[in-house]
Amino acid sequence: MAKEIKFSDSARNLLFEGVRQLHDAVKVTMGPRGRNVLIQKSYGAPSITKDGVSVAKEIELSCPVANMGAQLVKEVASKTADAAGDGTTTATVLAYSIFKEGLRNITAGANPIEVKRGMDKAAEAIINELKKASKKVGGKEEITQVATISANSDHNIGKLIADAMEKVGKDGVITVEEAKGIEDELDVVEGMQFDRGYLSPYFVTNAEKMTAQLDNAYILLTDKKISSMKDILPLLEKTMKEGKPLLIIAEDIEGEALTTLVVNKLRGVLNIAAVKAPGFGDRRKEMLKDIAILTGGQVISEELGLSLENAEVEFLGKAGRIVIDKDNTTIVDGKGHSDDVKDRVAQIKTQIASTTSDYDKEKLQERLAKLSGGVAVIKVGAASEVEMKEKKDRVDDALSATKAAVEEGIVIGGGAALIRAAQKVHLNLHDDEKVGYEIIMRAIKAPLAQIAINAGYDGGVVVNEVQKHEGHFGFNASNGKYVDMFKEGIIDPLKVERIALQNAVSVSSLLLTTEATVHEIKEEKAAPAMPDMGGMGGMGGMGGMM
């Protein structure tokens, strides 16, 4: 297929047009007074969202070059959401502002490489100031505040997340699912999570979230590597008769065995998933034993005189629900005996008390938390399916952002943290590096300005007022007042601000240093030929009808 090439300003201007369209669709969702975006779905009812990344994911433009620009910034929004759980709109607004300012200077003759270097130095200095200004998340109240803001100012969601963290600990496992009624609920169930994802994406049952979910499932636990199908065929036939899903946790599953499982999963013959066993060496054996005790199963190991070929269904563990993504496996509602679990917990506590190695102690404490902490399940209620999906997305975002706040600390929210950090940065740069530095200094005002505009205020006036002051002074877009942001509970996770700025600078630098684009030329499909009308000459005789 023929390709078209665009060069320099022509290419960058088209890329900018794509970024602008994406930005214009996403920016309206920003802040406590952000607006909704209605998205048409290929099937079912349209979805309503105030989540920037959900809007970005749906955007596909007809112009191939503009679409490349939009897709690059869309990737930034997604990566920011993956890493920090929030800040997607901030990253998009920053990327657009940096690209817009940069494009104007490069078109006027600035050196893109020097400009990029200045931008990188400015961003690094601002991030260092953000870190200095951050403070650790203290109690339940601050966790509630962070979660509330990330859930688009929904206090009920903020309180649910804070309650969940209080019950399972800051490092505990919290999952989100749909409630049967319209009320939100919080349940704590016995469960465990370990850091191994599915061995093949073909095991996925939810394509949108890329997760595999197995309900009322059997669990096969073995410390053996499975490479031949004949090893597990007898056991598979027995579980198929029971009609229940199966999760295989083994040292590894490869070759013919994995291929056969995937093919049978795709054909609908087996409802199955497979993951590698967590840990290494002796720790792996102990962790397999932990899972076995939690689920009421038995580790099939040759050391115990057990083989896969002769294994019975009674050896399998059982769980009410298993959720697997590309990185983690969560087992909820294991069917093991509570007394066995308590004995195992006591055994691990004894090992913690007797070990002298800090590393071993840390790993034992991780195992203890997995066994005894349980899994908090936030059940989201809503009156309609559209509302349910929108609310569930908000809870997921708020949960990730809250974990980010606990991890790295918090800064003042409402777009003010970037401005405060920038006020303390003074770099002595020259020529086009200075141009890059000034681009960042202007662009970091954009998030606050956009929050104010969405709330019905003049963005420029609000930014100027905030810049006149120092400390925690900022703008509360909910009521239009200038307040102490920490006292009002308007806070953002440092990680969200940091990653949003880093990703925005990264993608803007790529776009500004792009000198050519290559894309396929869409071939126009020829219109279908008109049918031959030769045999219809007799129609001329219809003239007498006049």
Swiss-Prot record:
- Recorded GO terms, molecular function? ATP binding; ATP-dependent protein folding chaperone; isomerase activity; unfolded protein binding
Query: Known catalysed reaction(s)?
Result: ATP + H2O + a folded polypeptide = ADP + phosphate + an unfolded polypeptide
- Keyword Ribonucleoprotein in record: no
Name a biological process GO annotation: protein refolding
Q: Which PANTHER family match?
A: 60 KDA HEAT SHOCK PROTEIN, MITOCHONDRIAL
What does the UniProt function comment say about this protein?
Together with its co-chaperonin GroES, plays an essential role in assisting protein folding. The GroEL-GroES system forms a nano-cage that allows encapsulation of the non-native substrate proteins and provides a physical environment optimized to promote and accelerate protein folding.
**UniProt protein name:** Chaperonin GroEL
The gene is groEL
